[in-house]
């Protein structure tokens, strides 16, 4: 115990010589008393120890009384003193505390925490709070650890209230609080007495601490004595024994807790975070920082202190080492928490030091900036303030806080890299960062890692010295030898089903090669005239020639002649035509050879009475040798006796006319007269050129077995008969007949050229056989609803073709103008438009009619009738349709009106006369229906009588057909009501009149066409059904009204349709009727085709 007390006494003497006393302000003492509570184990040792300790403190305080003024001058805030790097004396704990807490090496580069908060007028950030706690904890931990090792009483020198200081280099230190003023004088006296007694040299001024630090140290010792030993407080100023003081100084630092310092540090940091915030607003912080604050401000437990009234004896000296180790555990926990807050704990020292350095630097630079603003712009601001009262108010508002806020914004932008002005920016070189693999390989090459050796089968494998190719070959050689390809046995191939595409391609590859057939050439004139005389034709060539036996007889000349003299109604006139029949047959044959080929008009067959058949047989028997002689001889007109005197050609096996008809009667008993060959009918086959390409084979009502070269018509004689009509009873003289035969028997090329040129460009295009054959066999089975839909689509398409410049399209779309005539304009007061039930067009009263549509389903409708191609001309879009051919001359006279922007169909509609618009009914370029032409009864030059034929003028027209139809109907109805004798006469006249009209061609042909026949009305089947219906109605008697009602129900309800749709329905109806006999016609064709080589 004696040696130990001597060591403590020596340490106390040395520390007392180094300590400095200073005055502390009044009012701080009461706050500092509870800051450092010491529970010394020697609290009950006596008053002597306390008195000695107090005397020791006074001596140190008095020694520093003279240096007070000098210290305050050097450091304005009381922190200037010995530097941090000053050497620590061995065993001197007070010197260590002064270096850490009270002394600053460079006060110009140091700012306090209060200065930072006042400069920015803003609280600290969370990162800055973490840095402050870490820097304080690290510094205090070093001081506490070194003080324990030195064994000095460092706890007594710690201040209760201290202030934080930041250096520009990132370091921190602290300054203590001031002492109470009433204790300054007494402590100075005690310090001077102690200095005189010990006579120790004073320390240099450069190493002295500040007045505040000395006062804090003296107050700390005095605080410890008065707080923990208050029952000896009256003995402070009395001298005590030195041995008791040594024992007291030895035991004090072992029992004082560090929690008071840590708690006060937490309060300072939290106050900085809550600086300048409203009272009702709490600072925002993370949960981790909040937990750290709770740990730093936790209350002390009973385990951290020792009760004063318990005498533990010698045991407390045995636990001295353990208490010293446990004193710094709180600091270690705080430092570790701050390190774990970062992603890289190893860089915590550098990071937190950089944060403190930035905070101090920004504050110092702000101060320099504000000082420059004050020095340079003070005069200007004063002058501006004096001149304008508004400026004074603005300057008053613009206080220090605004400048600080501006400075913070500038610093923040600079930290983020904002450019202050534009500069020539040059891109820095691209820095390529290595991949992790490259970094690992570089570290391996630099031998930063020590690789472990890998053992293979208990041994380290040797280095591979062979290349990859050699290793592959070695591996192949080590394997079993391969077999030859010829010795290998492969399994059966897997059966795979070919795809549809592969099957299609395979069928194409294996397809049969078709035999190449040269295109047929036009037969020469000799072969066309004599197809059966050429015995060198091949079988395939003969199949291409369609034989029609009706052309081998010229029975049609009888009806041609009767059409020229249709007004003759007596039997003498009829015999006159029979006598002159051979001469006209010769003329008809010449004209037939000179006319071009034309496709047949697709209307049904005709029913012929037996009288006409007998006349036709007789005529054919007389004309057969004449035709053979005329066609085989050179083309020149010979007298009739010479022609009959020529020897006939060599006899060949052939059928006579009677045998031929007898064969058909036996083979086709079930067919009616309409399905038999035309040589047994009274009417001629019609020739026409229509706009809708129909099927040649299916729409024929006669067997098309006649050679195509003879499918022409007697147009020359017909045009003559139409041009010069003879009065009844007048006959031609032989001279006139001879002149007529010589005139018509001219050069064939001239006649052919003349007849072809008269057809016009549109008609020529439809004489092409290939065009008719390709597009003639397309048929559909449609319903009435589908036809309505097709017509509506075609209406929209035709509407798109209207021009937009003349407002025609707009008026038609808004249903202001008639769709067909484009002339009648509708209004609210009238006239009103009528909507067609089929095409939904709005037409005027002149362009619509009411008709009955009895069927809801139509079979075998030709596609050409409902196709959009009917809207334009078949040849080209710039040529008019055949129904418009009559207006070609008038349209061409309009000049430039038919240019590209106005369709010709539109121009034809606009230029069409009103009477023609009433009678016209076409669908595109399809043939017009004759049903609407019977209302015009005022055509001049036509007279209809009940017993005499009508004489026509040279100008034919549509009204002629209507009048003849009306005359026929009148005659048929009146004949049923007359006596039998008179009825027979009228029936004979009606028969001749009907047969004369049956030879007429369709009225849809142009006027100048060779096949044009002006008195055409409809097909024979339609006339037959009309006549039979008329007779049935008159023969019904009393059941006439009932039959009429039943037929009205069968015929259907009348619906308003436009003229175009009515023509379409009529054409569809007639085409369907013609389709019914097409199968029988095919059978007849197949039966008669093989008779071509034997029939002449």
Curated annotation (Swiss-Prot):
Entry-linked CDD domains: FYVE_SPIR, WH2_DmSpire_r3-like, WH2_DmSpire_r4, WH2_Spire1_r2-like, WH2_Spire_1-2_r1
GO CC annotations, alphabetized: cell cortex; cytoplasmic vesicle membrane; cytoskeleton; perinuclear region of cytoplasm; plasma membrane
PROSITE patterns to which the protein is assigned, alphabetical: KIND (PS51377), WH2 (PS51082)
Region (Disordered): 1-79, 184-211, 560-588, 614-656, 693-762, 874-899, 912-958, 997-1021
Comp. bias regions, Basic and acidic residues: 737-754
UniProt-listed GO biological process terms: actin filament network formation; actin filament polymerization; actin nucleation; cleavage furrow formation; establishment of meiotic spindle localization; Golgi vesicle transport; intracellular transport; polar body extrusion after meiotic divisions
The WH2 domain, residue ranges: 436-454, 500-517
Keywords: Actin-binding, Cell membrane, Coiled coil, Cytoplasm, Cytoplasmic vesicle, Cytoskeleton, Developmental protein, Membrane, Phosphoprotein, Protein transport, Repeat, Transport
Single annotated GO MF: microtubule binding
Reported modifications of this chain: Phosphorylated by Jnk kinase (bsk).
Occurrences of domain KIND (ranges): 111-366
Residue spans of biased composition, Polar residues class: 37-51, 921-941
Membrane topology: Peripheral membrane protein
Tagged with keyword Transport: yes
Keyword Protein transport: yes
Recorded superkingdom: Eukaryota
Subcellular location: Cytoplasm, Cytoskeleton; Cytoplasm, Perinuclear region; Cell membrane; Cytoplasmic vesicle membrane
Family under the similarity heading: Belongs to the spire family.
Function description: Acts as an actin nucleation factor, remains associated with the slow-growing pointed end of the new filament. Promotes dissociation of capu from the barbed end of actin filaments. Involved in intracellular vesicle transport along actin fibers, providing a novel link between actin cytoskeleton dynamics and intracellular transport. Required for localization of determinants within the developing oocyte to the posterior pole and to the dorsal anterior corner. Links Rho family signaling and Jnk function to the actin cytoskeleton.
Record note on quaternary structure: Interacts with bsk, Rho1, Rac1, Cdc42 and wash. Interacts with capu.
Domain statement: Binds to actin monomers via the WH2 domain. The Spir-box targets binding to intracellular membrane structures.
Name the record gives this protein: Protein spire
Lineage: Eukaryota, Metazoa, Ecdysozoa, Arthropoda, Hexapoda
């Amino acid at each position: 115990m004696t040696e130990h007390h001597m060591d403590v006494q020596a340490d106390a003497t040395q520390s007392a010589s180094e300590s400095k006393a200073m005055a502390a302000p009044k009012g701080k003492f009461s706050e500092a008393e509870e800051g450092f509570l010491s529970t010394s184990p020697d609290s009950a040792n006596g008053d002597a120890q306390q008195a000695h300790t107090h005397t020791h403190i006074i001596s140190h305080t008095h020694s520093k009384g003279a240096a007070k003024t000098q210290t305050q001058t050097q450091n304005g805030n009381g922190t200037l003193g010995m530097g941090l790097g000053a050497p620590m004396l061995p065993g001197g704990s007070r010197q260590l505390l002064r270096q850490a807490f009270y002394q600053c090496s460079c006060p110009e580069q140091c700012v306090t925490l209060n200065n930072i908060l006042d400069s920015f007028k803003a609280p600290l950030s969370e990162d800055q709070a973490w840095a402050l706690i870490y820097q304080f904890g690290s510094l205090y931990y070093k001081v506490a650890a070194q003080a324990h090792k030195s064994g000095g009483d460092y706890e007594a020198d710690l201040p209760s209230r201290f202030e934080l200081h930041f250096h520009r280099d990132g370091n921190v230190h602290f300054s203590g609080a001031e002492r109470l003023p009433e204790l300054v004088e007494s402590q100075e006296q005690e310090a001077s007495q102690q200095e005189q007694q010990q006579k120790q040299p004073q320390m240099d001024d450069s190493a002295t601490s500040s007045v505040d630090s000395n006062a804090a140290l003296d107050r700390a010792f005095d605080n410890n004595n008065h707080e923990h030993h208050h029952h000896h407080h009256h003995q402070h100023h009395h001298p005590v024994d030195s041995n008791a003081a040594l024992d007291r100084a030895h035991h004090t630092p072992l029992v004082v807790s560090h929690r008071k310092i840590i708690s006060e540090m937490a309060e300072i940091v939290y106050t900085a975070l809550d600086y300048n915030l409203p009272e009702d607003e709490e600072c925002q912080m993370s949960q981790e920082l909040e937990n750290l604050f709770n740990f730093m401000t936790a209350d002390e437990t009973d385990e951290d202190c020792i009760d004063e009234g318990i005498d533990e004896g010698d045991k407390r000296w045995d636990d001295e080492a353990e208490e010293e180790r446990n004193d710094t555990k709180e600091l270690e926990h705080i430092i570790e928490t701050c390190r774990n807050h970062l992603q890289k704990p190893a860089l915590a020292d550098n990071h937190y030091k950089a944060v403190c350095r930035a905070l101090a630097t920004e504050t110092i630079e702000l101060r320099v900036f504000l000082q420059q603003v004050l020095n340079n712009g003070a005069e200007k601001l004063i002058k501006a303030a004096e001149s304008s009262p508004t400026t004074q108010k603005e300057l008053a508002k613009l206080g220090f806080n605004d400048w600080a806020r501006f400075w913070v914004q500038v610093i923040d932008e600079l930290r983020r890299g904002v450019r202050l002005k534009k500069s020539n920016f040059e891109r820095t070189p691209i820095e390529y960062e290595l991949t992790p693999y490259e970094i690992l390989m570089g570290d391996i090459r630099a031998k930063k890692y020590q690789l472990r050796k890998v053992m293979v089968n208990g041994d380290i494998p040797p280095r591979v010295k062979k290349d990859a190719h050699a290793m592959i070959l070695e591996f192949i050689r080590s394997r079993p030898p391969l077999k030859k390809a010829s010795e290998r046995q492969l399994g059966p191939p897997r059966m795979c089903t070919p795809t549809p595409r592969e099957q299609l391609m395979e069928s194409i590859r294996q397809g049969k090669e078709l035999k190449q057939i040269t295109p047929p050439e036009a037969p020469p004139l000799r072969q066309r005239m004599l197809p059966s005389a050429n015995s060198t034709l091949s079988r395939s060539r003969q199949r291409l020639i369609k034989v029609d036996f009706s052309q081998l007889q010229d029975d049609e000349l009888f009806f041609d002649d009767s059409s020229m003299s249709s007004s003759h109604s007596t039997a003498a006139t009829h015999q006159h035509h029979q006598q002159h029949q051979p001469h006209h047959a010769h003329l008809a044959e010449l004209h037939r050879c000179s006319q071009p080929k034309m496709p047949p008009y697709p209307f049904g067959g005709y029913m012929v009475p037996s009288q006409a058949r007998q006349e036709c047989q007789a005529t054919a028997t007389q004309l057969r040798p004449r035709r053979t002689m005329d066609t085989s001889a050179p083309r020149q007109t010979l007298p009739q006796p010479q022609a009959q005197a020529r020897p006939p050609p060599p006899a060949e096996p052939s059928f006579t006319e009677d045998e031929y008809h007898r064969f058909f009667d036996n083979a086709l008993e079930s067919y009616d007269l309409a399905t038999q060959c035309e040589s047994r009918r009274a009417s001629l086959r019609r020739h026409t050129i229509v706009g809708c390409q129909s099927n040649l084979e299916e729409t024929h009502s006669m067997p098309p077995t006649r050679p195509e070269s003879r499918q022409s018509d007697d147009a020359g004689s017909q045009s003559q008969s139409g041009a010069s009509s003879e009065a009844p009873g007048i006959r031609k003289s032989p001279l006139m007949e001879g002149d007529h035969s010589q005139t018509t028997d001219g050069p064939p090329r001239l006649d052919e050229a003349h007849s072809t040129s008269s057809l016009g460009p549109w008609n020529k295009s439809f004489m092409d056989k290939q065009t008719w054959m390709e597009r003639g066999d397309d048929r559909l089975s449609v319903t009435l609803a589908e036809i309505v839909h097709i017509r509506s689509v075609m209406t929209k398409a035709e509407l798109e073709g209207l021009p937009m410049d003349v407002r025609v399209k707009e008026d038609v779309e808004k249903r202001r103008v008639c769709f067909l005539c484009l002339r009648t304009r509708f209004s609210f007061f009238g006239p009103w438009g009528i909507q067609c039930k089929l095409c939904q067009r709005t037409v005027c009263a002149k362009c619509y009619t009411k008709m009955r549509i009895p069927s809801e389903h139509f079979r075998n409708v030709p596609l050409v009738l409902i196709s959009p191609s009917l809207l334009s001309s078949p040849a080209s879009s710039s040529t008019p349709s055949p129904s418009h051919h009559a207006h070609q001359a008038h349209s061409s006279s309009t000049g430039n009106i038919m240019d590209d922007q106005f369709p010709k169909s539109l121009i034809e509609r606009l230029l069409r006369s009103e009477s023609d618009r009433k009678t016209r009914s076409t669908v595109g370029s399809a043939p017009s229906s004759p049903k609407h032409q019977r209302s015009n009864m005022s055509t001049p030059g036509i007279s209809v009588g009940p017993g005499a034929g009508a004489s026509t003028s040279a100008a034919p027209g549509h009204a002629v057909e209507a009048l003849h139809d009306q005359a026929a109907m009148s005659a048929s109805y009146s004949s049923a009501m007359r006596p039998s004798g008179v009825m027979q006469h009228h029936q004979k006249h009606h028969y001749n009149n009907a047969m004369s009209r049956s030879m007429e061609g369709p009225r849809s042909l142009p006027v100048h066409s060779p096949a044009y026949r002006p008195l055409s009305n409809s097909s024979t089947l339609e006339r037959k059904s009309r006549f039979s219906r008329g007779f049935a109605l008159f023969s019904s008697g009393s059941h006439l009204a009932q039959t009429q009602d039943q037929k009205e129900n069968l015929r259907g309800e009348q619906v308003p349709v436009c003229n175009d749709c009515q023509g379409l329905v009529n054409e569809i109806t007639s085409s369907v009727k013609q389709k019914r006999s097409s199968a029988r016609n095919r059978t007849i064709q197949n039966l008669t085709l093989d008779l071509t080589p034997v029939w002449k």
